[in-house]
Amino acid sequence: MSSFFETVRKRFDKAEKRLDQFNAGPALDILGRVERLGYDVASVSGLPETRLNELLLFERATGDSVTAMALALDPDSIGCAMLGRAENVEAGNRVRGTSTVASVPVGEALLGRTVDSLGNPLDGGSKLEASPREPVDKPAPGIIERDFVNEPLYTGLAVIDAMLPLGRGQRELIIGDRETGKTAIAVDTMVNQRDSGVICVYCAVGQKLSSVTEVIDAVRRYGAPERCIFVIAAADDPPGLQWLAPYAACTMAEYFSERGKDALLVIDDLTQHAVIYRQLSLLLRNPPGREAYPGDIFYIHSRLLERAAKLGRERGGGSLTALPIAATEEGNLSGYIPTNLISITDGQIVLEPRLFHEGQKPAVNVGKSVSRVGGKSQVTAMRQAAETLRLEYAQFLELEIFTRFGGMVDERTKRIIEHGRRIRAILTQPQFAPLPMPHQVALLLALNEGMLDRLPLEKVPQLRDSLRRWFSDHGSAVFERVAVTGEVDEASRKSLRENVAKLVFELSGSATPSLAPS
């Protein structure tokens, strides 16, 4: 009964606010004028009350209108970015203010949909007119509203989950040269959320439609598209739509995190977003700074990524994890935009072309990569299994260099190198084949106990597949225990040790003992 009265009270309060805003006098419509138009930006005069990010309607010669957004406010003019095609819009045409800032539809109706930066459907589905709308540019949660990042977000990639763990509410930059697998890591992370309940939002900024289509098809084939939203601003869209896309996608993801759910936001990519903003700023005649970027380029990315957070209990306890992607040139991490993004985020996953061309995929340079806050969210089982992994792998990479020159090495060095090669084999995974956390723990425990050192190197991928089948057919109880508790008790450790040893024995070419269910 109390909930009924609470609902009635809220509706009366809403009606009272509407009455307070009602004006029975004559409507006053203030019109502006297009002074200059070109390259999808315009200068407008006669609208002194316009707010930043307000939507404006430009009248066309054909009688309809096109939407633009106010990006620069001067005493005598307004700089606008067109959010639609500017055909038939000419200097002298009338401009009408809307008194509303840019907003997008949010809510459950967006799940499974492909939309543009304004929430208009791109998949041929119905319009989202009944969905609630929220502004694209919202303030980030304050310090008091946040909580510690203490829950893991699994990517399904052993190299990340073991050595660069992510937490829910973290911001982790994926950075590297072109064609090194940056988007592949993000897509694999989205695919791995198919059983986790995490809402995924993928935002493409200035990408080719063919590349975007591949991402959407991959998620629909391998992931859970019914819990994904795709926000697309392709390379041939107006620059205003491309600039707006990450903020719109963040608003859509925030809707779920503010209601106690966990959301994942992938932005592909922020380097292109910075280029678009530089283009708009120069066309709007804003003063350029370093590398011709405007002076507030750091701010536009920080105010976006600061919206990703783990919220406290008072705010519902939800989280928004951000995986922004950035491109480098010739592996240069000291460029203007890369250094900005590295300083804003909570860590970076650095990809190298050399590793990619050598067949190590994901091509993660572990030495240059770091996760600053995710380690606190790592479960006990994974933390114990990967405790010495990074050190052993770094030692192997250092020693491997000497073997390339044909130098003689002692037996201890040979063992370290052979062990390191098996670490690398475990960390190399095919795309769209994420490994659950218990599966990774089992492989790492076998590695730590030296079982894989007795297995031929080329058989390591087969062991991974055999272990997946064993978990499915016989080891479901062990799998559930490790997944739920985050720990490997003595019974689970014994079962994993015995059955992995049997699989290694089988793959080594000997007779196969039968696998006992656990």
Set out the residue ranges of the language-model regions.
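N-terminal accessory targeting/assembly segments
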Residues: 1-113, 118-122
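Conserved catalytic/coupling modules of large nucleotide/cofactor-utilizing molecular machines
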Residues: 2, 272, 282-518
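P-loop NTPase nucleotide-binding/switch module
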Residues: 93-95, 102, 109, 122-170, ...
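Active-site phosphate-binding and catalytic loops of NTP-dependent enzymes
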Residues: 20-24, 64-67, 102-106, 120-127, ...
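Conserved P-loop NTPase nucleotide-binding/switch module
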Residues: 178-199, 204-205, 209-211, 222-223, ...
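Conserved helix-turn-beta segment of the N-terminal RecA-like "Helicase ATP-binding" lobe
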Residues: 214-226
